């Protein structure tokens, strides 16, 4: 864990004008970037640097796959992020090329974008918290992928099934944001018999955290005295949502498995298995999300 240091404000390049000053390497790079931006603006070149120098810290962290931008904000506010040895508490702090950025003391490197589909086994946690003693998704996948990735959304510890993994924060934001409404399908194993009448009632939805959640689809796959199997598709993403909706109708879930995310099915992926997404799968998933939100 990075020790919290007193937050320092940036000094203007060139110092205060009182006495001789020495530029740090970062000040030199900032000055060069500013000069380049000003030059680009004068000659009419459309350049990102002509408007701002560097990249916002929260955006930079998300782009490197640390987590979604919202989660990166939380890490910054929590004092987990340092730049060049100084803890930064402002998500809008500008990161320059060559800056040493660390999260919990671990240096974050710029790398290529990674996208994977993973089958999370039951009992595994969707967290990167190093203080956690239970098995985490990252403990299983880190040896199998060429860079750091995070889970796109969550599955609770007792659930199993499909998870997307990436180091692309923008992709993660698109897939998880409620306005995009990516459909996810679950198979739920109930520990008692239920009827088609029970299913009809549950199709009306239930209030979860003050918001009414209505399944996109809900069907009874089988039912007997020993138990029942239900398939539910939703486009929300609240904590333990499927279990909570069914519980409103006295359906007690003993096992839950996510079998589909958008256009991606479980197919031949075994528990603990992982595979990269194809470019077409990734592009189709993003297009599906944007279409659902009306951005297409």
Please name every model-derived segment:
Residues 25, 32-296:
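Basic, flexible Lys/Arg- and Gly-enriched helix-loop patches that mediate nucleic-acid binding at interfaces
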Residues 1-37:
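Charged, low-complexity terminal tails
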């Amino acid at each position: 864990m990075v020790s919290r240091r007193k937050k320092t404000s940036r000094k203007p390049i060139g110092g205060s004008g009182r006495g001789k000053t020495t530029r740090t390497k970062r000040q030199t790079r900032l000055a060069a970037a500013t000069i380049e931006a000003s030059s680009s603006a004068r000659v009419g070149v459309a350049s990102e640097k002509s408007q701002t120098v560097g990249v916002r810290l929260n955006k930079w962290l998300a782009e490197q796959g640390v987590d979604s931008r919202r989660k990166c904000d939380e890490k910054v506010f929590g004092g987990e992020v340092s730049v060049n040895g100084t803890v930064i508490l402002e998500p809008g702090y500008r990161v320059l090329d060559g800056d040493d950025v660390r999260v919990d003391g671990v240096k974050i490197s710029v790398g290529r974008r990674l996208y994977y589909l993973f089958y999370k086994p039951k009992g595994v946690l969707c967290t990167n918290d190093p203080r956690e003693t239970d098995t985490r998704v990252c403990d299983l996948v880190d040896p199998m992928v060429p860079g750091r990735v995070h889970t796109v959304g969550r599955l609770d510890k007792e659930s199993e099934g499909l998870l997307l993994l990436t180091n692309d924060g923008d992709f993660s934001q698109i897939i998880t944001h409620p306005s995009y409404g990516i459909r996810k399908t679950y198979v739920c194993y109930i520990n008692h018999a239920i009827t088609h009448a029970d299913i009809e009632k549950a199709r009306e939805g239930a209030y979860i955290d003050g918001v009414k959640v209505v399944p996109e689809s809900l069907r009874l796959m089988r039912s007997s005295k020993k138990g029942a199997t239900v398939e539910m598709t939703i486009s929300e993403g609240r904590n333990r949502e499927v279990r909570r909706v069914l519980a409103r109708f006295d359906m007690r879930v003993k096992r839950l498995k996510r079998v589909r995310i958008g256009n991606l099915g479980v197919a031949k992926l075994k528990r603990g298995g992982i595979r990269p997404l194809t470019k077409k799968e990734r592009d189709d998933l993003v297009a599906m999300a944007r279409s659902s939100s009306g951005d297409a």
